C-alpha cells in the first residue's frame, strides 16, 4: 500500500529521519521529520495555475502544535486547539522567511505549506524540525523552488558553540540563534543574545551554516528517489516591455528619487507609474497593450534598478544621506501624565510611542505550551495602525507582522531586565507606531528602553537598535544604515541589530538573494555597531539611567517571608483570612509555595497594614511583651481581648485592675481599646493577659517599675 522512502542521518548528537510515502499522500509533497522523539509532518500543495489578476506571490505557511504531541489536553474551555498561539505565529514566520525568496521569480501560483507537530519529546524544539520538513516537502512537490534549505539552532555554553541544544541546555546558553540557509549561503537569522560581541555572533552564524550541510545533503538524496517531476513554469519574457517603459519614464523616476520627502516622492513615483500604465496597459483604447499586472512588475524592477545604481555610483541615498548616516533622532520621556513610564521616540519619519505599565503577579500572562504551563512576566505588544503610513486599512487583532515585530523588540530588551527577585513586577510595554518609514521595530526597541527607565525599572543598560540594508551587484555592494521603507523593499537584505554599548542582544536578518558572504555580514555588523552607538548617545540626551523611584501611579510591592507551615493560617479556611486582609487593607497579596508573600498597593499605608496583619498571623506573640488590643467579648470571669492579629486572649477579672472589680461590664465595654501584657499560657495553651500591670495611658510596664522601686539601695 505504501511506497515509503526514508533518509536517516546523525546530526548534532541525535538521529534525524526524513520519511515520505506513508502520510498525507495526496499533498504535492509530504515529509515526516523525526529528530529525537520530536515529529513534524510538513505538507506542500500548490495551485497549477495563478488566479486571474494575481500580481503577487501568494505563499501561506501554517505551523500548528497539537497538544496530543506532548500527551496533553488543551486548557481552553472547548478543550481543543483554537487560534494560533504566539509561538505558532512566530514559527510560521520563521519558516516563511527563508523559503519565500527561493521561489522562481514571476511564479504567482498559490502555495500552502502546513507543518503539524505530531510528537514532542520535550527536549528538541519542533521549530527547527518543522523548517527542515517544510524544505524537504517543497523539494519533493515539484513546485518551482530553488532549494533545499536547512536550519539549525546554535547555543553558546561556557564559551563553546552547541549545535541544536536541548531545551534544558538552552537555559544555560548565552545565545539562542536560529539560522536557515542553502548549501551556499545564509538566508535568515533570528536570535536572542546575552550581550555578546559581533565576532561571537558572526561565529555562531558560520557555525550554524556549516552544521546544517548534512541536512541539505539528506534532503537532496531523498529527492533523488522521491521527488515529482518539476512543474512546467516559464517566467514571462519582459525585456521588450521593460526597455519601452524605461525609455518613457526612466527620467521621471530618477527625478522622483531625488525628492527627499516621503509623501512628495511617492506622489511623483505614482505619477510616473500612471504615465506608463496609460501608455502601455491593455484597454479599450489600446487593445494590443500589455497586462496591467505584468506592467506593474516591470515598473518595480526599473524602479529598483534606478535606486540601486544611484546608491552604488554616488554613495547618496533616496533622502540624500550617506550610506552610514542615521536620520535625526529625538527622544522624549514622561509624555503621558498617568502612565507608569512613557517615551516618544522619533527617528526621521518613523515614530513610536512606547508605554510601560507595571503590575503584580495577578497580571502575569499564563502560557499553555506543549512544554507545560508557565507564567510570562514581561510582555511587549507592538501596534501598527494604517494611519502610520498615511493609509486606511483594517483594525483589529494583531497580524503576524505585528506579533513578529513585538517579539523582536522583546528579545532585544529581555537580557537587560532585572531579575524577578530584584524587581518583582510584571512588566507590559505597548509600542504604538504613529509614523513609519522604515525600522519601526528598532524604534520600538529604543523607545521601550527609554520608557522602562522612565518607569523606574532598573534596566542593566540602555538598549538601542538599528535596521541595516544592502545593495549587492556584480560590481560592488553598499551597506546602508537606518534604512527607509523604500530601501527595504528595493534592497537585498533586511538586517536588524539591537544591543547595548557592550554587546548584541538581538539580531534578525532576512536575505532576498544568494551570495551574501561572511565579509558582507561582518561589514554590516561593524557598521551597525557605529549606528547603535550614535543612537544610544542621542537617547542619552533624554535619559541616561533609570529613575531612582517608581512613578506616582505605579503599584508598590514589598516582599516578606513566612514559615511554610504558616501559609495555611494566612490563607484561612476556604481563603477566608486572606480575603479579609485584602478587603480591609486594599492591598493585593500573592502567596508563593515557599512562603514568599508579595504585597502590592498604590499607597504605602495599605502595604504596611497588610504586612503587619500577616506578620501577626505568621509569628507568635512574645511572653512579657505589651500589646494594644480590643475587647471582643465580656464574660462573668473576665474579658477576651484581640491583641495579636487574629489571636485572642483572656484578661481574668483579677487582672483587670488593682482594685476589686465586682462586675466586668462596669469597667470594660466591647470594642474598647486596651493595653495588655502577655503573662504566658495555661496548661491548655490558652493565652493569659493582664491589664493591671500596664499603664493604660502610656503603655508602661508597671511591674517593671515596681521591681525597680523594690531594689535595695547601693551600700
UniProtKB/Swiss-Prot annotation:
SUPFAM superfamilies: Eukaryotic type KH-domain (KH-domain type I), Nucleic acid-binding proteins, Polynucleotide phosphorylase/guanosine pentaphosphate synthase (PNPase/GPSI), domain 3, Ribonuclease PH domain 2-like, Ribosomal protein S5 domain 2-like. Its EC number is 2.7.7.8. Residues 692-715 are annotated as: Disordered. The keyword RNA-binding applies. Mg(2+) binds at residues 488, 494. Its cofactor is Mg(2+). Residues 555-614 form the KH domain. Disulfide bonds: none annotated. The keyword Iron-sulfur does not apply. GO terms for molecular function: 3'-5'-RNA exonuclease activity; magnesium ion binding; polyribonucleotide nucleotidyltransferase activity; RNA binding. GO terms for biological process: mRNA catabolic process; RNA processing. It catalyses: RNA(n+1) + phosphate = RNA(n) + a ribonucleoside 5'-diphosphate. Keywords: Cytoplasm, Magnesium, Metal-binding, Nucleotidyltransferase, RNA-binding, Transferase. Residues 624-692 form the S1 motif domain. It comes from the Bacteria. Belongs to the polyribonucleotide nucleotidyltransferase family. Involved in mRNA degradation. Catalyzes the phosphorolysis of single-stranded polyribonucleotides processively in the 3'- to 5'-direction. This is Polyribonucleotide nucleotidyltransferase. It comes from Phenylobacterium zucineum (strain HLK1).
Amino acid at each position: 500500500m505504501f511506497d515509503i522512502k526514508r533518509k536517516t542521518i546523525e546530526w548534532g548528537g541525535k538521529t534525524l529521519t526524513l520519511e515520505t510515502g506513508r502520510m498525507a499522500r495526496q499533498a504535492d509533497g509530504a515529509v515526516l521529520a523525526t529528530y529525537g522523539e520530536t515529529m513534524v509532518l510538513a505538507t506542500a500543495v500548490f495551485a497549477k495555475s495563478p488566479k486571474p489578476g494575481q500580481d503577487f506571490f501568494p505563499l501561506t505557511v501554517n505551523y500548528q502544535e497539537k497538544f496530543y504531541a506532548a500527551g496533553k489536553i488543551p486548557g481552553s474551555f472547548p478543550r481543543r486547539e483554537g487560534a494560533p498561539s504566539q509561538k505558532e505565529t512566530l514559527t510560521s514566520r520563521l519558516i516563511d522567511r527563508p523559503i519565500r525568496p527561493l521561489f522562481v521569480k514571476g511564479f504567482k501560483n498559490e502555495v500552502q505549506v502546513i507543518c503539524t507537530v505530531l510528537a514532542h519529546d520535550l527536549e528538541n524544539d519542533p521549530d527547527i524540525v518543522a523548517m527542515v520538513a517544510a524544505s524537504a516537502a517543497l523539494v519533493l512537490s515539484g513546485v518551482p523552488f530553488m532549494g533545499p534549505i536547512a536550519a539549525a539552532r546554535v547555543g553558546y555554553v561556557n564559551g563553546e558553540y552547541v549545535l541544536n541544544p536541548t531545551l534544558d541546555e538552552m537555559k544555560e546558553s548565552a545565545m539562542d540563534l536560529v539560522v536557515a540557509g542553502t548549501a551556499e549561503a545564509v538566508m535568515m537569522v533570528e536570535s536572542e543574545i546575552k550581550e555578546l560581541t559581533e565576532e561571537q555572533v558572526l561565529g555562531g552564524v558560520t557555525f550554524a551554516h556549516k552544521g546544517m550541510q548534512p541536512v541539505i545533503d539528506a534532503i537532496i538524496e531523498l529527492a533523488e528517489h522521491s521527488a515529482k517531476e518539476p512543474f512546467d513554469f516559464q517566467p514571462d519574457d519582459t525585456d521588450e516591455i521593460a526597455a519601452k517603459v524605461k525609455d518613457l519614464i526612466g527620467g521621471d523616476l530618477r527625478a522622483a528619487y531625488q525628492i527627499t520627502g516621503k509623501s512628495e516622492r511617492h506622489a511623483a513615483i505614482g505619477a510616473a507609474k500612471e504615465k506608463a500604465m496609460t501608455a502601455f496597459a491593455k484597454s479599450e483604447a489600446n487593445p494590443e497593450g500589455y497586462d496591467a499586472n505584468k506592467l506593474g512588475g516591470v515598473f518595480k524592477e526599473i524602479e529598483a534598478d534606478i535606486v540601486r545604481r544611484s546608491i552604488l555610483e554616488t554613495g547618496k541615498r533616496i533622502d540624500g544621506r550617506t550610506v552610514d548616516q542615521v536620520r535625526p533622532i529625538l527622544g522624549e520621556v514622561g509624555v503621558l501624565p498617568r502612565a507608569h513610564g512613557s517615551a516618544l521616540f522619533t527617528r526621521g519619519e518613523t515614530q513610536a510611542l512606547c508605554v510601560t505599565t507595571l503590575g503584580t503577579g495577578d497580571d502575569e500572562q499564563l502560557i499553555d505550551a506543549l512544554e507545560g504551563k508557565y507564567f510570562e512576566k514581561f510582555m511587549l505588544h507592538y501596534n501598527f495602525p494604517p494611519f502610520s503610513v498615511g493609509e486606511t486599512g483594517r483594525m483589529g487583532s494583531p497580524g503576524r507582522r505585528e506579533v513578529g515585530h513585538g517579539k523582536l523588540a522583546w528579545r532585544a530588551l529581555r537580557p537587560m531586565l532585572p531579575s524577578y527577585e530584584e524587581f518583582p513586577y510584571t512588566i507590559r510595554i505597548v509600542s504604538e507606531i504613529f509614523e513609519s518609514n522604515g525600522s519601526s521595530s528598532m524604534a520600538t526597541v529604543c523607545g521601550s528602553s527609554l520608557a522602562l527607565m522612565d518607569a523606574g525599572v532598573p534596566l542593566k543598560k540602555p538598549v538601542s537598535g538599528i535596521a541595516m540594508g544592502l545593495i549587492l551587484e556584480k560590481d560592488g555592494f553598499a551597506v546602508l544604515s537606518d534604512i527607509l521603507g523604500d530601501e527595504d523593499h528595493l534592497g537585498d537584505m533586511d538586517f536588524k541589530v539591537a544591543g547595548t554599548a557592550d554587546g548584541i542582544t538581538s539580531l534578525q536578518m532576512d536575505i532576498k538573494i544568494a551570495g551574501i558572504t561572511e565579509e558582507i555580514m561582518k561589514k554590516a555588523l561593524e557598521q551597525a555597531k557605529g549606528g547603535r552607538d550614535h543612537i544610544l548617545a542621542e537617547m542619552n540626551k533624554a535619559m541616561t539611567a533609570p529613575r531612582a523611584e517608581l512613578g506616582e501611579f505605579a503599584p508598590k510591592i514589598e516582599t516578606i517571608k513566612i514559615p511554610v507551615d504558616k501559609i495555611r493560617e494566612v490563607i484561612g479556611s476556604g481563603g477566608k483570612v486572606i480575603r479579609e486582609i485584602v478587603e480591609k487593607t486594599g492591598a493585593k497579596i500573592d502567596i508563593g509555595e515557599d512562603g514568599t508573600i508579595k504585597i502590592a498597593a498604590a499607597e504605602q499605608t495599605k502595604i504596611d497594614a497588610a504586612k503587619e496583619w500577616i506578620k501577626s498571623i505568621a509569628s507568635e506573640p512574645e511572653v512579657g511583651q505589651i500589646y494594644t488590643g480590643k475587647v471582643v467579648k465580656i464574660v462573668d470571669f473576665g474579658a477576651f481581648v484581640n491583641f495579636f492579629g487574629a489571636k485572642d486572649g483572656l484578661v481574668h477579672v483579677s487582672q483587670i485592675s488593682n482594685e476589686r472589680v465586682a462586675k466586668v461590664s462596669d469597667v470594660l465595654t466591647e470594642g474598647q481599646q486596651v493595653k495588655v501584657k502577655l503573662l504566658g499560657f495555661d496548661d491548655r495553651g490558652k493565652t493569659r493577659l493582664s491589664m493591671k500591670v500596664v499603664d493604660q495611658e502610656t503603655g508602661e510596664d508597671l511591674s517593671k517599675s515596681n521591681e525597680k522601686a523594690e531594689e535595695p539601695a547601693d551600700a
